């Protein structure tokens, strides 16, 4: 069954607090957009320059949600009353569940903020590595940061989140420290399991696991199995990029969903913007095979540029063809990034990030489209999200029709497929080029595979530029 996930940063939603995720917001997500899950990014307490206890090594003013300072706390700035922040978090969880939604938060296993309180207290700092150390050290060497850090000193230096060096560069994750994992069980494993179980006990329904390729698969296998023994319905989503390892992360490690950034996302972006042939969409699903239902499809998230930005499609309407394929091609889960459905462009210059086509995760900023949505864009998104929940799309079979087309059908710019659950059937035609009329033929073998008897098998349709057409054929 099709699962829809909505990612948002609570600090940029509504009033910027847990209380801003209120009944009105949840009704919008559930009733207007048909969401099943809400992924709240930036809940667990992270390094920030704001508030009563500002940290010194921070990217931006608000700080990255992925530089965790305390794994057992939430950000005070998200609470109306900072002293009651955990109670306010639990109240938000209850509202989410009462609305028929489930909650995802981030689990960041690879690294922590430099001023983290949960790790390193018992480390032997005289050696570079020891199996029971939480961090990697550079004995005798101070940390040399690429930026000024308000008098912060670290001696000996520790390895940063993505680089083994006492002198990380400006493009490195210098505000974080890499955690030490072994391929065999250590106390770091136990600490991380305790953290995940803590949040599961708070009512969290799933974890989006950050950069899992940087931690041992053996650890994630053990952690997922351990959590699911107590919480069998807990969902784990992996941020992964190596397609060759997809099957391992599903079948051996145990993840429920995987980012398909390196597959369908990259393909659709290249077809939409860089002239790649639409044939690549077929090649991508063929390479995935039976893994398709485990892929998390998306066109935006906090790491990627906005579809409507000058770096991608330049306007939201030019992303409709890609949206139709990403959302409707199969019954894989689909993720929407807050403001995407309203036409957000992400073209403001924002502190640490600058003008990069993204909504900054490092600074206090605005999402203008949430305040003044493009109503025509919101209507189109609401409509196609509704169709994605129809049984033919939510759990039906897919038949790629591109191979059997000819004439004015352009396999480099057009992509057509049919979906059916045996009772209802639909034809979807996506056009990545200019407005064009073309004919789509449905062969007998497609009808047999889909279990339908269509009244017509030849359709001449006009599909607008960078758009799609959806037709019911049974």
Model-derived features with residue positions:
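Conserved, mostly hydrophobic/aromatic
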Residues: 8, 40, 71, 96, ...
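Aromatic- and acidic-residue-enriched segments that line the glycan-binding/catalytic groove
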Residues: 48-68, 109-165, 251-259, 350-359
